[in-house]
């Protein structure tokens, strides 16, 4: 008589395997770094898709895509997350994008190499990124149009002379990390249909070496890409009008400003479907200030959904208990700006900045999405969450979901989060949920995303 438990039968064991577990039985990797990326990030990607109720075929497809196409581009697995947190970016981010219609999963990564590939020839990674998006575009199941990417790259990438100037040891070694990152790649993993790509250009280095403000670089690039078609110019116009009044300056590593443009992004689709995004950071954390940017000084007041979205931003502002005031990036940067000593710093700051002052790493990110033929750019806000314990962040996300009427997502969020970080005490960690973003459209309602940085912890 067979006395073995039924669950030990091979067919039952096979049926219990998740897509990640099944693929793990078959995959091999070229080195320990690739294997570590798979062991640490693969389960998180698999879980986020299961929790979002992706069908089984999509789970297998996207996990295999991650293993075979993305992991080889990530470079060495960080020996310690601390160094990458300090540099302001880590090679891989997984985000969950929540809407009434369902949850989708997205990846974002900075292409790297195992030995600092040709660093003297490509110190800022522009050539590598061009290679990467072209290679990914050849994968079946990926929909990509590279025409606009190539146009933007020809305008926004550093020239050879600019690279050589910035790569001089006296300059390059003193650049902060955000000035050394040129591109990142975003990957949308839809519940149905094809994978799509997004490319981001960080323009601080270009602005520094060219002495052209990032606003001007961004606006001119969009106008050039538009080529008289009037696809993106209508949506750009209110953005340009609003920020031209601020007299934006070129980027400077030693003189960070309250409002700074950072990046421009492009969804790699044909021009009639592509979307462009302009990103800025804001260190004056006041709701009135956010409301002014959100509406572009009232220019968007008649935009459908803009006021409803702003009211939900107000609710989220309260849920997160934002400390209102001027948040300086670092005390040392403030000292550099003043050229003074710590004893005289407080008095000098009080004169120039009447708001309450904080010396921390807090800031907001906002972007405006410009769509072909649409005169209304769509605002989105990102809250940096590193000052809160991860369980407190989870409480805030649950409160937001309940406020939006997403009862099922609210009931599952904390349990799901704990599954992504099985070896972490979320009462003692912070920054695993790095950002929380929010936008609103009259057509689709609220859209909020959580960005995970501590992958596989």
From Swiss-Prot:
Signal peptide stretch: none
PANTHER family in the cross-refs: INDOLE PRENYLTRANSFERASE TDIB-RELATED, PRENYLTRANSFERASE ASQH2-RELATED
UniProt entry keywords in alphabetical sequence: Prenyltransferase, Transferase
UniProt EC number: 2.5.1.-
Keyword Transferase: yes
Positions of disulphide bridges: none
Species of provenance: Aspergillus ustus
Effect of a null allele: Impairs the production of usterphenyllins and uscandidusins and leads to the accumulation of 3,15-dihydroxyterphenyllin.
Keyword Transferase part of the UniProt annotation: yes
GO MF: prenyltransferase activity
Gene that specifies this protein: ucdE
The protein, known as: Prenyltransferase ucdE
Listed GO biological process terms: alkaloid metabolic process
């Amino acid at each position: 008589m067979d006395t073995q438990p039924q669950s030990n039968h091979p067919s039952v064991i096979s049926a219990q395997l998740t897509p990640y577990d099944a693929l793990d039985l078959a995959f091999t990797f070229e080195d320990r770094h690739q294997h570590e990326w798979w062991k640490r990030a693969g389960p998180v990607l698999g879980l986020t898709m299961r929790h979002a109720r992706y069908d089984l075929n999509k789970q297998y497809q996207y996990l295999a895509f991650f293993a075979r196409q993305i992991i080889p581009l990530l470079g060495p697995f960080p020996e310690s997350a601390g160094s990458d947190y300090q540099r302001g970016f880590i090679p891989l981010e997984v985000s969950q994008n929540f809407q009434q219609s369902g949850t989708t999963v997205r990846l974002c990564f900075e292409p790297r190499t195992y030995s600092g590939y040709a660093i003297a020839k490509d110190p800022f990674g522009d050539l590598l990124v061009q290679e990467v998006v072209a290679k990914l575009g050849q994968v079946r199941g990926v929909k990509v149009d590279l025409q606009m990417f190539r146009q933007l790259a020809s305008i926004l990438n550093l020239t050879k002379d600019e690279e050589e100037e910035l790569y001089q040891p006296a300059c390059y070694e003193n650049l902060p990390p955000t000035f050394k990152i040129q591109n990142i790649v975003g990957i949308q993993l839809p519940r149905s249909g094809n994978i799509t790509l997004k490319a981001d250009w960080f323009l601080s280095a270009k602005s520094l070496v060219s002495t052209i403000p990032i606003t001007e670089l961004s606006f001119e690039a969009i106008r050039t890409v538009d080529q008289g078609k009037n696809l993106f110019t209508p949506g750009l116009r209110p953005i340009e009008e609003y920020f031209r009044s601020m007299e934006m300056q070129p980027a400077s590593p030693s003189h960070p400003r309250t409002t700074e443009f950072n990046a421009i992004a492009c969804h790699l689709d044909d021009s009639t479907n592509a979307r462009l995004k302009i990103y800025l950071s804001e260190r004056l954390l006041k709701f009135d200030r956010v409301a002014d940017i959100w509406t572009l000084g009232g220019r968007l007041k008649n935009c459908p959904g803009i006021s409803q979205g702003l009211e939900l931003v107000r609710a989220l502002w309260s849920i997160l208990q934002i400390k209102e005031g001027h948040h300086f990036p670092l005390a040392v940067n403030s000292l550099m700006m003043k050229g003074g000593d710590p004893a005289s710093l407080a008095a000098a700051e009080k004169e120039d900045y009447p708001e309450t002052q904080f010396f921390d790493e807090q800031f907001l990110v906002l972007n405006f999405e410009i769509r072909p033929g649409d005169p209304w750019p769509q605002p989105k806000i990102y809250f940096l969450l590193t000052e809160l314990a991860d369980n407190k962040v989870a409480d805030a996300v649950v409160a937001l979901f309940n406020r939006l009427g997403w009862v099922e997502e609210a009931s599952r969020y904390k349990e799901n989060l704990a599954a992504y970080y099985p070896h972490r005490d979320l009462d003692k960690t912070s920054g695993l949920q790095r950002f929380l973003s929010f936008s609103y459209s009259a057509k689709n309602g609220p859209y909020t995303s959580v960005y995970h940085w501590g992958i596989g912890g």
